[in-house]
A protein has these predicted regions:
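Non-cysteine beta-strand/loop elements that form the S-adenosyl-L-methionine
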Residues: 73-75, 84, 186, 343-349
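Acidic/His- and Gly-rich active-site-bordering loop/insert found
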Residues: 2-100, 105, 109-125
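Divalent metal-coordination and catalytic microenvironments
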Residues: 22, 60, 74, 104, ...
Length: 393
C-alpha cells in the first residue's frame, strides 16, 4: 500500500496540471465533447482500451494479466455547472458562465491517475477494472444510459469519490446507509381565466392559486410527514400573468423534492399532486403536475464501506463515518441499485486556502489540489483490493 501511495504521490504535478486543464475548459452535461476527447487521450497514453457510450460518456476497460477474476467499476463524473467563476487564479474557467464548481474536474483527474497507476500493475491482478467517466450528473441524465448499456453487468463492486469541502483535506468520509437524498423535479401548470383586475369575480386568478399552493406545499413537510424523517419541498420559480392590470390566466411553479426513502418519494408526489388539484379547484381553476426522476436516494452498502475503510487505513488516510446527511442528490445512487458499492467523500478543505472551505455550486469554490494523489490512490487501491483480496492484507 505504501508503494502504491508513493506512486500516486509522484504523479502530483501531473495530476494538478491535468485538473487545471479540465478546470479551464468546463462543459455542461451532455456537451462534454472536449472533456471526453481529453480523457480518451489519457487512456490511450496508458494503453487502456476505451469506448464511447452515447456522445460523451467514456468507458475504459483494463484487463489484468495476473491470477483471479471479477469486475470492479470505478466512476467519476465529468460535467460542469452554469456558474460564473469569480476566483482570480491562473486556471480559472475560460468559458463565460460555466465552471467546475462541484469538483468534477478533480474526480476525473483522480480516476485518470488511478488508471495510470493500475495500468502499470496489470500483472498484479486478474479480471477487469472498468473506468466510467460519466457525463450529465448535474442534470440526472448520466448514470442510467451507462446502466442500460450494460456497463454494470457482472460487476462485483462499484466505487466512486466526491470532493468534500466540509471535511479536512487528506481525510475520507465513508458512511454506511443513507448519504444523499433522492431528487425529483416538478413543474405545476395552473389554468385560470383572465379578467380585468377591477373585476376579479369574473376571472379565475392563477397567480393567487399559485401563491396559495407555494405556502400549502410546506404544510406537507410540517403536517403530513414524520418530523424525524428528512424531507424537503422547494419551489424556485413562479411565473404568472401577462399584464399588471389583468387577472393571471396561467401560472407555472417549478421546484424539487428531496427525500431518503421510496415511501417518502411516493408520498410527496401523491400529496403535491392532490394539493395542486384541490387548491386550484377551490378557486375554479385546474392544474397538472409533471415529474422528472433525477436521482434515487444514495444508500451505501455497509460491508463495502468497511472494505473502503480498511483500504484507506492501509494507505494511511484517516476516515470518518460522521458526515451529515446531504439533501443534495447524486446519480451514483443508480449504480448502487445494480450492485454492491460505496460512494466516499474526499476531504479537500484546507483553512490556509479559504476558498477550499467554501461549499460547492458557488463561483468562488475551489479544492486543495494536494489531495488529488490521495484520491487516485484510493481509487486504485480499492480496485486492487477487490480483484486481489491478498493485496490489502
Amino acid at each position: 500500500m505504501n508503494a502504491l501511495r508513493e506512486e500516486c504521490r509522484q504523479l502530483r504535478d501531473e495530476l494538478i496540471a491535468l485538473r487545471r486543464e479540465f478546470h479551464r475548459a468546463p462543459e455542461l452535461g451532455l456537451h462534454e465533447y472536449h472533456t471526453a476527447a481529453r480523457i480518451e487521450r489519457e487512456l490511450d497514453r496508458c494503453g487502456i482500451p476505451h469506448e464511447r457510450v452515447g456522445e460523451t460518456a467514456v468507458v475504459g476497460h483494463l484487463t489484468g494479466n495476473g491470477n483471479g477474476s471479477g469486475l470492479v467499476v470505478l466512476r467519476a463524473d465529468i460535467d460542469a455547472l452554469p456558474i460564473q467563476e469569480t476566483n482570480d487564479v491562473p486556471y480559472r474557467s475560460q468559458t463565460p458562465g460555466m465552471m467546475h464548481a462541484c469538483g468534477h474536474d478533480a474526480h476525473t483527474t483522480c480516476l485518470l491517475g488511478a488508471a495510470k497507476v493500475l495500468s502499470a500493475h496489470r500483472a498484479d491482478f486478474g479480471g477487469e477494472v472498468r473506468f466510467l467517466f460519466q457525463p450529465a450528473e448535474e442534470i440526472g441524465q448520466g448514470a442510467r444510459p451507462l446502466i442500460a448499456a450494460g456497463m454494470l453487468d457482472g460487476a462485483q463492486r462499484v466505487f466512486g469519490l466526491h470532493t468534500a469541502s466540509d471535511l479536512p483535506a487528506g481525510t475520507v468520509g465513508v458512511k454506511p446507509g443513507a448519504n444523499n437524498a433522492g431528487v425529483d423535479h416538478f413543474i405545476i401548470r395552473i389554468h385560470g381565466k383572465s379578467a380585468h383586475v377591477s373585476t376579479p369575480q369574473l376571472g379565475v386568478d392563477a397567480l393567487y392559486i399559485a401563491s396559495e399552493l407555494v405556502v400549502a406545499l410546506q404544510s406537507i413537510v410540517t403536517r403530513m410527514t414524520s418530523p424525524v424523517e428528512p424531507v424537503l419541498i422547494g419551489v424556485g420559480k413562479l411565473n404568472a400573468g401577462t399584464a399588471y392590470n389583468a387577472v393571471a390566466e396561467t401560472a407555472m411553479l417549478e421546484g424539487t423534492t428531496r427525500m431518503f426513502s421510496p415511501e417518502s418519494r411516493a408520498h410527496l408526489r401523491e400529496t403535491i399532486n392532490a394539493a395542486a388539484a384541490h387548491i386550484s379547484a377551490l378557486y375554479g381553476g385546474t392544474a397538472e403536475a409533471e415529474w422528472d426522476d433525477f436521482a434515487t436516494p444514495l444508500t451505501n452498502d455497509a460491508g463495502v464501506c468497511g472494505e473502503v475503510e480498511r483500504v484507506a487505513d492501509a494507505l494511511g488516510i484517516p476516515t470518518t463515518a460522521n458526515r451529515a446527511l446531504s439533501l443534495s442528490g447524486d446519480d451514483f445512487a443508480e449504480y448502487l441499485l445494480q450492485t454492491k458499492g460505496a460512494y466516499a467523500y474526499l476531504g479537500t478543505a484546507n483553512p490556509k486556502k479559504p476558498h477550499t472551505c467554501i461549499s460547492n455550486h458557488r463561483g468562488d469554490f475551489d479544492i486543495d489540489e494536494e489531495t488529488l494523489p490521495l484520491g487516485a490512490a484510493l481509487y486504485a487501491a480499492y480496485a486492487l483490493s477487490v480483484l486481489d483480496p491478498q493485496f490489502a492484507k
